[in-house]
């Protein structure tokens, strides 16, 4: 009886198989990463919508008045605390500055706290940045900020005054204030209805600090506070009618602004497109001229 020996792989054949697997992996991994980023983008949109719903519930309970949105970490705002990359900053991990009650926190309690039960909605799921606390790294509790032109009577100004920071432009204290000229920035376009006024945004990890996000409506030379680009170069916004959008950035800032893990503000708008660019897109959804 004759036995036929079984032929094994040659080295060349094995290398070909390995090369094919490597090529397939190279094709599939970016697609998987993009799919994961898309999934976190959807989750982030949902978080912003939940915050927007809490914001509207507050407005309904207070006769249309919006929650106060005062700058500064020790302010009476919709949230409190100061998010930073500085070591041993307790605000980085204090969820009571997000969802704490007046009984728990005192008069500086976060005004949306009673309307939100889950601290997770205050953070983008793609925000994996940490800060040092003692001898370990810990996750920071918040990624979101509110439109700085939404003041919610935080500064006790008169009915007909301009924004506390940019007097030629409109602030918003009540829902009934959401109207105005179709003109905000250099190229037309401004807030005329709730569908056009953004309320919450995910802020760039280096830029975020208090719960307040402002931009200069008179020039696009630099971003005072910078939106994030966690989702394939895009960032999420929620609006006063409680719809949410994923804005895909086109300009280098904010699309590819690096995260240095160093708290900073004032981002040069280098590489911006001439004319209507990402900066003016945000301004036209932030306020309108008086």
Task: Please annotate each region the language model reported.
Residues 39:
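Phosphate-proximal small/polar/acidic motifs at interfaces that engage nucleotide phosphates
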Residues 5-36:
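N-terminal single-pass transmembrane signal-anchor helix
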Residues 42-290:
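Short, well-structured segments within or immediately adjacent to enzyme catalytic domains
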Residues 1-2:
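N-terminal hydrophobic targeting signals that begin at the initiator methionine
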């Amino acid at each position: 009886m004759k036995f036929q020996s079984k032929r094994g792989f040659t080295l060349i054949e094995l290398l070909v198989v390995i090369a094919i697997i490597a090529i397939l992996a190279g094709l599939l991994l970016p697609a998987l990463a993009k799919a994961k980023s898309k999934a976190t983008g959807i989750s982030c949109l949902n978080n912003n919508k939940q915050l927007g719903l809490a914001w509207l519930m507050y407005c309904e309970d207070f006769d249309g008045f919006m929650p106060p949105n005062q700058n500064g970490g020790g302010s009476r705002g919709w949230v409190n605390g100061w998010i930073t990359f500085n070591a041993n900053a307790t605000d980085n991990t204090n969820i009571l500055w997000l969802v704490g009650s007046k009984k728990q926190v005192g008069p500086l309690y976060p005004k949306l706290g009673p309307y939100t039960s889950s601290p997770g909605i205050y953070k983008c799921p793609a925000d994996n940045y940490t800060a040092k606390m003692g001898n370990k790294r810990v996750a920071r509790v918040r990624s979101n900020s509110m439109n700085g032109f939404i003041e919610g009577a935080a500064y006790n100004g008169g009915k007909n005054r301009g924004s506390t920071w940019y007097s030629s432009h409109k602030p918003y204290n009540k829902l009934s204030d959401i109207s105005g000229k179709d003109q905000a920035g250099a190229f037309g376009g401004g807030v005329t209805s709730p569908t056009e006024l953004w309320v919450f945004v995910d802020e760039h990890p280096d830029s975020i600090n208090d719960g307040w996000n402002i931009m200069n409506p008179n020039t696009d030379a630099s971003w005072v506070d910078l939106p994030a680009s966690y989702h394939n170069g895009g960032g999420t916004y929620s609006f006063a009618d409680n719809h949410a959008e994923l804005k895909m950035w086109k300009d280098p800032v904010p699309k590819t602004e690096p995260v240095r893990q160093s708290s900073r503000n004032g981002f040069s708008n280098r590489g911006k497109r001439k004319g209507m660019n990402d900066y003016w897109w945000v301004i036209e959804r932030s306020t309108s001229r008086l």
